[in-house]
């Protein structure tokens, strides 16, 4: 039996790019005043692309845009939707069906809160409930919205009741649920800055450490033109009796306090290490601290602010 042969196509073989994985989508909805806007800000801080007040009918188009390679640096997309659209429930059901057809299954997050707490929040902010514009009082608006959204609440993948939540409690709840378990890096970002006191302390610093108790390499003629990134300067700094001990204790302090700050919902902390001119001692110490924090899986940025001035 003969075997048919097929000629190879002429011209270069073009390799097609691997398809991008489905984008992670979270639809945030719920009762007005229950924390939807705050939740969306948390998603934004966590690296999601956020759109608030999006008509449900536009969700498939928005998700399609986010599936492009140019948007791949975002961790996902969070869409805020509410009852201000008259046909909201019909549109969101249709949008979910359209997304399911392209293998995208959004997480539906519903923000809940008890009536008395909502009344207190509206009294504090003095903002009108969206349905009050239709001639209803606040309590009637809250009840109408709750009844209208009850089918959506039943559909939700996750309901967060913020009745007894502070803003920080809500932030922690969302961080815990949507943390990237595949990444080794901690959620809190650390900025390390070396600086010179004679040029001013960085205003954004959360912690400031003064290294002027160490002998200044500036007064060693061979070291003066160098900086703390040079091996000779770093060796001179850390051979001093208390320099290495200070460095170890500083790193221990940071490794103790950073997880606590992360638990409280902090996303970044700035550590400033200063000496007189910001060229020798502070630079050497900042380099050492940065290396230790990176080894502990913290995402760290390092800036030598006054290196060229010192």
Curated annotation (Swiss-Prot):
Keywords, alphabetical: ATP-binding, GTP-binding, Nucleotide-binding
Keyword match Thylakoid: no
Cited SUPFAM superfamilies: P-loop containing nucleoside triphosphate hydrolases
UniProt xrefs under InterPro entries: P-loop_NTPase (IPR027417), RapZ-like (IPR005337), RapZ-like_N (IPR053930), RapZ_C (IPR053931)
Keyword Cell division set for record: no
Gene Ontology MF annotations: ATP binding; GTP binding
Membrane-spanning intervals of the chain: none
Pfam families reported in the protein's UniProt record: PapZ_C, RapZ-like_N
Binding residue positions for GTP: 82-85
Annotated residues for binding of ATP: 30-37
Family: Belongs to the RapZ-like family.
Protein role: Displays ATPase and GTPase activities.
Protein name according to UniProt: Nucleotide-binding protein Ddes_0972
């Amino acid at each position: 039996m003969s075997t048919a042969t097929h000629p190879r196509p002429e011209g270069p073989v073009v390799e097609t790019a691997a398809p991008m994985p489905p984008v992670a989508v979270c639809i945030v909805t719920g009762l007005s005043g229950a924390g939807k806007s705050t939740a969306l800000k948390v998603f934004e801080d966590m690296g999601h692309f956020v759109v608030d007040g999006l008509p449900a009918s536009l969700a498939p188009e928005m998700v399609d845009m986010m599936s492009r390679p140019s948007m791949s640096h975002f961790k996902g997309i969070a869409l805020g939707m509410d009852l201000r659209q008259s046909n909201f429930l019909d549109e969101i059901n249709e949008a979910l069906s359209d997304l399911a057809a392209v293998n995208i299954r959004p997480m539906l997050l519903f923000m809940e809160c008890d009536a008395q707490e909502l009344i207190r929040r509206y009294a504090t902010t003095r903002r009108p409930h969206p349905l009050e514009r239709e001639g209803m009082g606040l309590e009637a608006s809250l009840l109408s919205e709750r009844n209208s959204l009850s089918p959506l609440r039943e559909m939700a993948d996750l309901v967060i009741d913020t009745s007894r939540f502070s803003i920080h409690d809500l932030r922690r709840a969302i961080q815990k649920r949507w943390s990237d378990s595949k990444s080794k890096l901690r959620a809190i970002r650390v900025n390390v800055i070396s600086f010179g006191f004679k040029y001013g302390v960085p205003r954004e610093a959360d912690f400031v450490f003064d290294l002027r108790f160490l002998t200044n390499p500036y007064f060693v003629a061979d070291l003066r033109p160098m900086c703390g990134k040079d091996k000779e300067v770093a060796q001179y700094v850390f051979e001093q009796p208390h320099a290495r001990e200070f460095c170890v204790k500083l790193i221990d302090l940071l490794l103790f306090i950073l997880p606590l700050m992360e638990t409280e919902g902090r996303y970044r902390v700035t550590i400033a290490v200063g000496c007189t001119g910001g060229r020798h001692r502070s630079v050497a110490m900042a380099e050492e601290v940065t290396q230790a924090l990176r080894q502990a899986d913290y995402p760290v940025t390092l800036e030598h602010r006054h290196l060229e001035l010192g």
